[in-house]
Regions:
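Alpha-helical structural signal in soluble globular domains
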Residues: 3, 7, 31-35, 81, ...
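Metal-dependent polysaccharide deacetylase catalytic core of the NodB/CE4 family, i.e.
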Residues: 15-97, 163-192, 227-244, 272
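Acidic-and-aromatic substrate-binding clefts and catalytic sites of carbohydrate-active enzymes
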Residues: 1, 14-27, 94-103, 122-126, ...
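Alpha-helical scaffolding within the catalytic cores
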Residues: 22-32, 142, 213-220
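Catalytic domains of cell-wall/extracellular-matrix polysaccharide-remodeling enzymes
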Residues: 70-157, 250, 255, 259
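Hydrophobic alpha-helical membrane-insertion signals
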Residues: 8-14
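Catalytic grooves of carbohydrate-active enzymes
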Residues: 1-2, 89, 150-272
Length: 272
């Protein structure tokens, strides 16, 4: 958040259920909301914590795998805890996958929700290349840009007003569509550290022109969409682990995110 703010950017802070029990995390979110205008959102990832395990007797975090009865109970617990800590309900939520029944329930029960990160693993035609028995192909075929999901199927855009689920859904990351023809694409995206995971940088200079080129490709979509373009840069604290990640040292992790924020900040200052 600090790096984004230094570059004149606002962020969406996705609070997890576990973080709602952390006074320091709540105070940081409140401060950045009041001072910088950051949005405080509610993620349905990060469910596992002592309180969750005691009630639901599981370490599973995949809300789409629970029964509908449990989904409703979890949503109620998480949303009400959020309200207790912040005094309002969130306008956006998200998970790695949000099935239609879950989305419909959230919109009906908490109508303030307008937006949700509703899918991830949007790799496309080569998604099968990295499937295993924990993920299968549940996420294959997720849309690549914002869409209005159908009440019947999250991955299907609503065909008309009757099918409109009442929210705008967005993908977890903005992937490189071209790269997905050669592989599953999860190492290629506008997330700076996806670029590191894909080893798409100069190991001597720690520069990554690919990142800026891909961001510009997404910006160019405005030419074909009445001036509108969409791009996501989704990052959590774990992506800047002091012990390193993806075989990269902390210094490179930090630099990539800092440079990414600086590039977006530069574009904003230029009115782009």
């Amino acid at each position: 958040q600090r790096l984004a703010h230094e570059n004149g950017l606002k962020v969406t802070i996705q609070m997890t259920y576990a973080s709602l029990f952390n006074d320091e995390a709540v105070e940081i979110a409140k401060h950045d909301h009041d001072v910088y205008g950051d949005e405080i959102a509610l993620s349905l990832l990060g469910l596992p914590c002592e309180e969750f395990r005691e009630k639901y007797k599981t370490k599973d975090f995949c809300i789409w795998m629970f029964s509908m009865e449990d989904k409703k109970a979890i949503v109620n617990d998480v949303f009400e805890k959020f309200h207790d800590r912040f005094g309002f309900y969130p306008e956006s939520t998200g998970s790695y996958y949000m099935d239609a029944d879950l989305t419909n329930y959230i919109k009906a029960t908490y109508p303030t929700v307008k937006c949700a990160v509703a899918t991830c693993w949007e790799e496309g035609p080569k998604a099968y290349h990295t499937c295993n028995n924990s993920w299968y192909t549940l996420f294959d075929g997720g849309p690549w840009a914002p869409w209005i999901p159908s009440k019947q199927n999250t991955h299907a855009p609503a065909a008309n007003a009757a099918e409109d689920s009442g929210i705008v859904a967005i993908p977890h990351l903005s992937r490189d569509l071209i790269a997905c023809y050669d592989g599953n694409g999860s190492n290629f995206g506008t997330h700076p550290q996806n670029v590191l995971r894909g080893m798409i940088y100069d190991t001597k200079t720690w520069e990554y022109p690919y990142l800026y080129n891909l961001i510009d490709q997404y910006r160019s979509l405005g030419k074909y969409n009445n001036g509108y373009a969409y791009n996501m840069m989704f990052v959590g604290p774990g992506w800047m682990n002091k012990m390193g990640r993806w075989e990269q040292p902390y210094e490179l992790l930090y630099k990539s995110y800092s440079d990414g924020c600086a590039y977006y900040g530069k574009l904003k200052k230029e009115g782009k």
